[in-house]
């Protein structure tokens, strides 16, 4: 779908791609705020989905999206010297974040673990199953799996379960604060 003469939005068959920055009602408030201030937002599409199909495997099957085109965002935390360090890790959906080795070393903590879901939801302002790397709290690192960079289409959360954002892998690397990490997913 062409948004204007300059930008062709990413799309999925059977779903209407809309310019995400022009449809804040379809994303979580922190995501809408981030889209409003990010130059890359013009290349981001949003699609409405059945909220019961928000989990990656269900969405992938229902909408014929290959797992390699899915970007899962998990929130990991650890502490050192009383200083908590948090990172959102975006990994290709057919892999799992290497939390115990790579993420732990990147955070420079002795032990890294998934942030409890209630905290991740409360602190991000996003819904369970919809957390996305765009619009996260200040101080959270954004780690992006290098395997996603060459994907022409990556489906990520929108902050809510009833929609997804569509981006290119290249655009993920351009997210505010993004750090591309080789081998982040295994």
Describe the residue ranges of each PLM region:
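Extended, low-hydrophobicity, polar/charged segments
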Residues: 1-186
């Amino acid at each position: 779908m062409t948004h204007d003469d300059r930008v062709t939005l990413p799309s999925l068959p059977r779903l209407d791609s809309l310019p995400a920055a022009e449809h804040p009602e379809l994303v979580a408030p922190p995501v809408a705020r981030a889209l409003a201030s990010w130059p890359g937002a013009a290349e981001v599409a949003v699609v409405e989905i059945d909220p019961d199909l928000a989990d990656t495997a269900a969405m992938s099957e229902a909408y014929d999206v290959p797992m390699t085109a899915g970007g899962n965002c998990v929130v990991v935390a650890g502490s050192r010297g009383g200083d908590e360090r948090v990172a959102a890790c975006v990994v290709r959906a057919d892999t799992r974040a290497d939390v115990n080795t790579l993420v732990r070393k990147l955070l420079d903590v002795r032990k890294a673990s998934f942030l409890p879901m209630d905290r991740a939801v409360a602190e991000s302002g996003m819904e369970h199953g919809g957390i996305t790397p765009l619009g996260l709290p200040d101080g959270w690192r954004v780690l992006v799996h290098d395997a996603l960079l060459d994907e022409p289409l990556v489906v990520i959360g929108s902050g809510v379960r009833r929609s997804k954002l569509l981006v290119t892998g290249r655009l993920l690397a351009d997210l505010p604060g993004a750090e591309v990490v080789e081998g982040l997913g295994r």
